[in-house]
């Protein structure tokens, strides 16, 4: 008898849980899925294929420009958004939303060479150099100034 009551109780709970899940969550409230994509690392002729595949796989958004400061500002004060405009247009064509990143994790080589004071310096005197991510010090006023300018240009162009 106890076994039958337990089985009946479990069956009721299971059906309630399944019913509740179907009423609690509808598609529009579920987490969106996305992918990081670095168009600056791929030949432009491959972009459309890649965006189509993202769409076909069910991705809903992509991140751009996370590590692209050197492509956005190849020389100090000279900005190039043409390549990124093309990538955004293709993302839009395939119904992908774009999360625009600020590129501050990877300063361009010209910045590290012209302003070495922006580089992280450890207590033992070791100085990080260009060639890895996160080698600039957020404590550096010069770095913050130049990062702000780049972010401002990005915002002006896409805002």
PLM segments and residue spans:
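Generic recognition of cysteine residues
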Residues: 10-12, 101, 136
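Short, intrinsically disordered, charge-balanced linker/junction segments flanking boundaries
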Residues: 17-20, 151-159
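Aromatic-lined substrate-binding rim segments of carbohydrate-active enzymes
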Residues: 48-126, 152-155
């Amino acid at each position: 008898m106890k076994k039958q009551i337990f089985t009946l109780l479990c069956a009721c709970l299971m059906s309630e849980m399944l019913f509740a899940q179907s009423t609690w969550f509808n598609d529009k409230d579920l987490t969106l899925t996305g992918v990081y994509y670095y168009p600056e690392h791929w030949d432009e002729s491959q972009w459309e294929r890649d965006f189509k595949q993202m769409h076909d796989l069910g991705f809903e958004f992509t991140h751009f420009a996370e590590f692209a400061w050197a492509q956005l500002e190849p020389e100090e004060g000279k900005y190039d958004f043409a390549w990124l405009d093309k990538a955004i247009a293709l993302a839009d064509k395939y119904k992908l939303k774009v999360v625009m990143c600020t590129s501050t994790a990877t300063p361009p080589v010209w910045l590290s060479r012209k302003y070495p004071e922006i580089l992280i310096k450890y207590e033992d005197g070791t100085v990080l150099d260009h060639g890895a991510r996160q080698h600039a010090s957020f404590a550096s006023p010069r770095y913050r100034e130049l990062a702000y300018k780049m972010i401002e240009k990005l915002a002006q162009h896409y805002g």
